[in-house]
Amino acid sequence: MGIQGLAKLLGDIAPSGIKENEIKNYFGRKIAIDASMSIYQFLIAVRSDGSQLTNEAGETTSHLMGLFYRTIRMVENGIKPVYVFDGKPPQLKSGELAKRTERREEAQKALSKAEEAGDTENIDKFSRRLVRVTKEHNEECKQLLKLMGIPYVEAPCEAEAQCAALVKSGKVYATGTEDMDALTFGTTVMLRHLTFSEAKKMPIKEFHLQNVLSEAGLSQDEFIDLCILLGCDYCDSIKGIGPKRSVDLIRQHRSIDKILENIDTSKHPPPENWLYKEARELFKNPEVRNPEEIELKWEEPNEEALVTFMCQEKGFSEDRIRSGIKKLTKARHGSTQGRLDSFFKVLPSPANKRKLQDGKGSQNKKAKTGGKFKRPK
């Protein structure tokens, strides 16, 4: 779920912290991608008849096709992706997971009714709600990434938290996910829609945490409390207090603790045994692997092993897979020059940066940043 309504709220209270960008402008960037979120997107991208892509054995292969081609597209645009997989969910998430199970059961009942009625629109709608990423999906995707030469990280807990840790340590430039709680975990740059299909024509939404906090007039601790008030995966929120009221309360009282001392709890009762302090601590100090102990290596794809896995085992067309591998190999060799601005330690002013870009020819055209924000790591 992430944080309820946060993207829209930030568009209202901190628009300078958000910009739209094109994938080509991330040339030379290392980006940590929330693997489960991406795999989920690939799985719900069902075909026009409402079914997922399967092989002759009836095994779902949508996730493998999506991962293969979207990863190639990123590498063709000079991006160095690293996928981060979820580990064991925190105990605080058990309530949210139970709610998701209930919603799936309701969706299953609704799907059965839609199938009886021949209601194709609702069949599609409720089929999507039943999709979930399994351990098998994850393991197959890890195998594919390894054969493609793309690094991945297994987080001990939440993938978004591990992505944020990689960004904060300077190992990567940004977190790629649809879940807004990557910002709550402290990622300095977050990209939405990065792994969407080109057919959707959705620009990449780029969030810069420091600009968001500055324009919203909040510290990171206050922002975390705001996210808990809006609704997160780890505890309930106060009923009857919407996004605008939540912002006003945080700006006035600066913490949930002070809000509880000052609001009329008879009108807005907090949840019983409210675990907001535990949720706050989880956002501030999540369980992650030490980024300094993580080595990220992008290597040559193993063509024959890829063909064996994707074609002989999973039933994909050999011509198409070999064509994809050629694109991947060519793109890898074309993106080794890196970003021009990665050679500079001092951050130039926006005006100086434009002068540098105007004077460096085609190499710099590839390396342009398209924005006024901080240089990459």
Swiss-Prot record:
Region (I-domain): 122-253
Cellular location(s): Nucleus, Nucleolus; Nucleus, Nucleoplasm; Mitochondrion
UniProt cross-references to InterPro entries, sorted A to Z: 5-3_exonuclease_C_sf, Flap_endonuc, HhH2, PIN-like_dom_sf, XPG-I_dom, XPG/Rad2, XPG_CS, XPG_DNA_repair_N
Cofactor binding: number and manner: Binds 2 magnesium ions per subunit. They probably participate in the reaction catalyzed by the enzyme. May bind an additional third magnesium ion after substrate binding.
Biological process, per Gene Ontology: base-excision repair; DNA replication, removal of RNA primer
Any single Gene Ontology cellular-component annotation: nucleoplasm
Region described as Disordered: spans on this chain: 337-377
Location of the region described as Interaction with PCNA in the Swiss-Prot/TrEMBL record: 336-344
SMART domains: HhH2 (SM00279), XPGI (SM00484), XPGN (SM00485)
Binding site for Mg(2+) 2: D179, D181, D233
Co-factor(s): Mg(2+)
Domain of life (superkingdom): Eukaryota
Keywords, comma-separated and alphabetical: DNA damage, DNA repair, DNA replication, Endonuclease, Exonuclease, Hydrolase, Magnesium, Metal-binding, Mitochondrion, Nuclease, Nucleus, Phosphoprotein
Chain sites annotated for binding Mg(2+) 1: D34, D86, E158, E160
Modifications after synthesis and translation: Phosphorylated. Phosphorylation upon DNA damage induces relocalization to the nuclear plasma.
Gene3D superfamilies associated with the record: 5' to 3' exonuclease, C-terminal subdomain, 5'-nuclease
Region of interest (N-domain), ranges: 1-104
Composition bias, Basic residues: 363-377
Subunit-structure text: Interacts with PCNA. Three molecules of FEN1 bind to one PCNA trimer with each molecule binding to one PCNA monomer. PCNA stimulates the nuclease activity without altering cleavage specificity.
Task performed by this protein: Structure-specific nuclease with 5'-flap endonuclease and 5'-3' exonuclease activities involved in DNA replication and repair. During DNA replication, cleaves the 5'-overhanging flap structure that is generated by displacement synthesis when DNA polymerase encounters the 5'-end of a downstream Okazaki fragment. It enters the flap from the 5'-end and then tracks to cleave the flap base, leaving a nick for ligation. Also involved in the long patch base excision repair (LP-BER) pathway, by cleaving within the apurinic/apyrimidinic (AP) site-terminated flap.
UniProt name for this protein: Flap endonuclease 1
Gene that encodes it: FEN1
